[in-house]
């Protein structure tokens, strides 16, 4: 993938741009039209200080200490202290890709001109992104309100020459990170520490990654599902547009259309059993548009929410320069992100659950009319027997992980922050769930290709044959038992590259052009 050259117009990021940011390094610049609003909001903060007005986050403490007035000589110390004290996360570091996406989201939000932060602070974040210097940010420690305080604090420590960062896979000090980017440690002005820390950007970055994973899984599951229909000599009639039109769900209709797109009438396998006596297929084949359509709807709904959040201002307090006003609110509360992530979790789990059932059908000779466990000379050969057990284990694990996180809340900050979203965990677990579902799909991919080879000399449709050939370039037909795990890994690697997206109809998935 070519490096994205992105000129940021604050509040105008697209899902496709965000997908690219999450997948590869970028060259980022700020559109000049954003500068006046940034400078005007900074001037409002400067007037507050000059006029000795009391405003939360500028010259007061934070959280339960909001009523504590801070002396003018301590204001710079206040901003430095909030960054260092709030950098209290634990656990493994976020992936560089996640940190990059989080930083771009934070830059986008700050550049809207409602945060009272100076242009040179925003430019420092841009310079770090362009130098591919990514702060080391622990994954755990945020409850998604008041924003993602700990993760964003860890991000911000590097601006002070503190903390750690990663460059070319090597962990370095914050001071060394700045040197690589050609920067010096900064002294934060009033409001700037809080502006950097307040926001939903960590949760949203995790959730966006989950969205993009879910989209790729949807495409692969549709392709693998169509392959399984062919391998099991399933009927195409359940994909007839009339069935789905009378129900009326747009995503179900679109899902059925995707199966028709893959299973076109040129298939020799389809023609070979067009007059068979079988009346109905099991649900895992027949009800794919209904189940996958529901998953697609959750993906689309979540995409809409996350696109809005990605371009939002989730700081507090907010600076409205046109009114010379600063207002405390609660845009940092990540409930929309948490609920979107919970719905993505349901979709990812169901995509995997349905795939596992299709694979189980293929190895059952009574249902698929294929050799037991998809291998000749059964007994001597066990074939795909234990691969299905692996799929079942992964599907079961996802059922637990899919439990909604947004229904949980624990009060924090001495009950000042008495309801929180748990958005960070809601979104963070999507990667693990995606890996589980990708593993399930890898097993189905292998199984369906094996089943299709047993239907030779008949061939499937061109797109299904293309999908099978992608796999056969890496994994050969099973004529007898062999070491299985490497083949699952090869199939998994193909799925991780989102190779099946090109086989899908255009404009089906929100972030895929």
Swiss-Prot record:
PROSITE patterns: PAL_HISTIDASE
Enzyme class, UniProt record, top EC level: lyase
Keyword Cytoplasm set for record: yes
Disulphide bond pairs: none
Superkingdom: Bacteria
Subcellular location: Cytoplasm
CDD domains per record: PAL-HAL (cd00332)
Range of residues in the leader sequence: none
Biological pathway: Amino-acid degradation; L-histidine degradation into L-glutamate; N-formimidoyl-L-glutamate from L-histidine: step 1/3
PTM field: Contains an active site 4-methylidene-imidazol-5-one (MIO), which is formed autocatalytically by cyclization and dehydration of residues Ala-Ser-Gly.
Placement of covalent cross-link 5-imidazolinone (Ala-Gly): 145-147
GO biological process, one term: L-histidine catabolic process to glutamate and formate
Record-level GO cellular component terms: cytoplasm
Keyword annotations: Cytoplasm, Histidine metabolism, Lyase
UniProt catalytic activity: L-histidine = trans-urocanate + NH4(+)
Pfam families associated with the record: Lyase_aromatic (PF00221)
Residues bearing the modification 2,3-didehydroalanine (Ser): 146
GO MF assignments: histidine ammonia-lyase activity
Chief location: cytoplasm
Entry EC no(s): 4.3.1.3
UniProt xrefs under NCBIfam families: hutH, PRK09367.1
Sequence similarity: Belongs to the PAL/histidase family.
HAMAP family per UniProt: His_ammonia_lyase
Name used for this protein in its record: Histidine ammonia-lyase
Natural source organism: Vibrio vulnificus (strain CMCP6)
Gene: hutH
């Amino acid at each position: 993938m070519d490096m994205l050259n992105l000129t940021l117009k604050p509040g105008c990021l697209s899902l496709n741009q965000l997908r690219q940011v999450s997948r590869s390094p970028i060259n980022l610049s700020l559109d000049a039209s954003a500068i006046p609003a940034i400078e005007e909001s900074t001037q409002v903060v400067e007037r507050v200080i000059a006029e000795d007005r009391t405003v939360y986050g500028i010259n007061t403490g934070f959280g339960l200490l909001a009523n504590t007035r801070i002396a003018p000589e301590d204001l710079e110390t206040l901003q430095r202290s909030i960054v260092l004290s709030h950098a209290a996360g634990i656990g493994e570091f976020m992936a560089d890709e996640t940190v990059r996406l989080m930083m771009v989201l934070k830059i986008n939000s700050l550049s809207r001109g409602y945060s009272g932060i100076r242009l040179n602070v925003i430019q420092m974040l841009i310079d770090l992104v362009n130098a591919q210097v990514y702060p080391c940010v622990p994954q755990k420690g945020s409850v998604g309100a008041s924003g993602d305080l700990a993760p964003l604090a860890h991000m911000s420590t590097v601006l002070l020459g503190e903390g750690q960062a990663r460059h070319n896979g090597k962990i370095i000090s914050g001071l060394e990170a700045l040197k690589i980017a050609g920067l010096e440690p900064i002294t934060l002005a009033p409001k700037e520490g809080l502006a950097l820390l307040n926001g939903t950007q960590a949760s949203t970055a995790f959730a966006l990654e989950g969205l993009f994973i879910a989209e790729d899984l949807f495409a692969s599951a549709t392709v693998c599902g169509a392959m399984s229909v062919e391998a099991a000599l399933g009927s195409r009639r359940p994909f007839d547009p009339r069935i789905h039109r009378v129900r009326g769900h747009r995503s179900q209709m679109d899902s059925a259309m995707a199966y028709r797109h893959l299973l076109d009438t040129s298939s020799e396998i389809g023609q070979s059993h067009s007059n068979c006596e079988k009346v109905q297929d099991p649900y895992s084949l027949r009800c794919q548009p209904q189940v996958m359509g529901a998953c697609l709807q959750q993906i689309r709904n979540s995409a809409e929410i996350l696109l809005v959040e990605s371009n939002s201002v989730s700081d507090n307090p907010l600076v409205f320069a046109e009114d010379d006003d600063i207002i405390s609110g609660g845009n940092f509360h990540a409930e929309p992100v948490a609920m979107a992530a919970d719905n993505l979790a349901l979709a990812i789990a169901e995509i995997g659950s349905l795939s596992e059932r299709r694979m189980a059908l293929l190895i059952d000779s009574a249902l698929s009319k294929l050799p037991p466990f998809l291998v000749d000379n059964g007994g001597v050969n066990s074939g795909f027997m234990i691969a299905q057990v692996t799929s079942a284990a992964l599907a079961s694990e996802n059922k637990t992980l899919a439990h909604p996180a947004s229904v949980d809340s624990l009060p924090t900050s001495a009950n000042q922050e008495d309801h929180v979203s748990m958005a960070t965990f809601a979104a963070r677990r999507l990667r693990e769930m995606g890996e589980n579902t990708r593993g399930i799909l890898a097993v189905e991919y292998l199984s369906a290709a094996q089943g299709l080879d047993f239907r030779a000399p008949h061939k499937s449709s061109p797109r299904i044959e293309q999908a099978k050939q992608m796999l056969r370039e890496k994994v050969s037909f099973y004529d007898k038992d062999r070491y299985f795990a490497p083949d699952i890994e090869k199939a998994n690697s193909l799925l991780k590259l989102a190779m099946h997206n090109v086989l899908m109809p255009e404009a089906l998935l929100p972030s895929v052009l």
